[in-house]
Amino acid sequence: MAAGGTDPQPVDHLTGWPAEDKRNEERSLALKIVIVGNGKVGFSLAEQLVREKYDVVIVDLREDTLRRAADALDIMSVKGNGISAATLIEAGAPDADLLVAATNSDEINMVCCLTAKHLGAKYALARIRNPEYNAG
C-alpha cells in the first residue's frame, strides 16, 4: 500500500495520466446523450452525466427550466416537443449514442423513443411508470 493509504494506480506510459482516468475521459468524450424532459428525473440525470463529462443536450417545452439547466450545467438546450422529429433533429438525436425520454407522460416517452430510433439514435430509453405497459 502506498503512503497515504491508497494503492497506486496504473499509469499510461505515454501521457502519465492514471490509466483509469484516461479510459473514462475517452469513453465520456465519445458519447452524446439527448435527454427529453427537464423535470426532476431529467435534470438529475443531466447533472450526473455532465459530472462524468458526457456531451448532454436537454429538450423541454418549458423555457424557464431549460434556462436553469443551461446556466447550472453549461449544456445545450432545445425548446420543443420531444415527439417532434424537427425538435429531435435540432437536439442531435440522429447522431446520439443514447436518447433518454424522461417526461411525465409514458406515451410521449414511448413515441419520442420510437421517433429517435427512426431518426438514427443508437439507443433510446423511455421512462415508463404505468405498470399496464409492462409486457407479460
Task: Describe these PLM feature segments.
Residues 1-8, 12-136:
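Cytosolic regulatory regions of ion transport systems
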